[in-house]
């Protein structure tokens, strides 16, 4: 009986490792030259297939490009979409979140994202700001051009719920700001709180 239980545990462990590998290859995050570049698969959340108009970066920034191979892309300036910027001497820490809001059900999922940029010429030892500037900061030049065939979806401002959990699925109806229900966690390895970290040079 014990060998059977041990074999079953090994199979469950291998299945868990495969699920982790599948989901972690479903995300690519880069930040450089004051650009935040994120690519995801619509299956990044366990047992959920997201449509491009159901997933948002930060405070409601929609997918900027949908690729034929089922890849969603977000390309935004690091001071937009409510992305938090924390400058510490020679590095800048960017923090935001990815939010899924179902159109057909009261289902919501969130994932925290972080990215570290190394500053070539640091001017501040500690400063913190949150995005939503209306124009380029002084001295910042636009060095990235949008593709000609890229179609930018109009900005959508969904009602996002706040939570201390880094990653969870909520059954809260997002159409109402006052009605709140208790969050139900994702039944997978992604139950654990985590942040996606990426280190990049400017």
From Swiss-Prot:
InterPro entries: PLAC1_fam. GO terms for cellular component: extracellular region. Expressed in oocytes in primary through antral-stage follicles. Expressed in liver and ovary. GO terms for biological process: blastocyst development. It is found in: Secreted. Residues 1-21 form the signal peptide. Residues 157-183 are annotated as: Disordered. The keyword Isomerase does not apply. The keyword DNA-binding does not apply. Keywords: Secreted, Signal. Belongs to the PLAC1 family. May be involved in cell differentiation. This is Oocyte-secreted protein 1. It comes from Mus musculus. The gene is Oosp1.
